[in-house]
Amino acid sequence: MIFDTHAHYDDKKFDADRREVLAAMPAKGVSLIVDPGCDGESSRTACALAQEFPFVYAAVGWHPEEWQSWNGESMALLRSLCAQPKVVAIGEIGLDYYWDTEHKALQKEMFERQLSLAIERKLPVIVHDREAHGDCLEIVMNYPEARGVFHCFSGSAEMAKELIRRGWYLGFDGPVTYKSNKKAAEVLAVTPLERILVETDSPYMAPEPCRGKRNDSSLLVYVLEKIAALKGVSAEEMTRITQENGCRLFGIEA
């Protein structure tokens, strides 16, 4: 059964049919989903979905792009939310310099404070790193007790090796299937099977042959098939391995 370790069913793109989509997942071979929050509202929604659906778990956190809504009450809210049942991680947190380079200092502060909370609560983190590889790596190296996954990993093979050496997991999703993405094969070549997680980032980044459509967890089969081919194992074996990896990181009993 498939473990989608990163899907945003709290996203507005699912407003029309959220519950129907989620209810159909077990019949489509999806056994577990982690829904990470991106701010206070989405973190609350992720927690609510985790309470409603037995196979959904939540992560709570403030995405770097949501810096405008970060305020003096944000950490207190996250501290409260991460004590709720079925919250298995702090995330989605990190740095994003693709859209915004004017607020790097604030993004770093948000990232570091949430890393500290994760360490305090003994929770893994889900890291967003877009066009900020050097700073993200430097920050997590400054927090050696932190553990977790670099979601939608887009760094180099050398960065991957350094993170793996430090016990981190790497998340792979739809872009792995894109013909233009040569870097994914290079990274997967140096990534041990036991450090691979699969994810959709639903509703975004649908894999080939569904690129451009709304993504959901059932489409993870295409990502699993591609990674399995690159690693020389069957899709069934890759599904089993990635489920075990996800359960190990997030402390979930399959």
Task: Describe every region a protein language model picked out.
Residues 1-254:
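Mid-domain alpha/beta scaffold segments of enzyme catalytic cores
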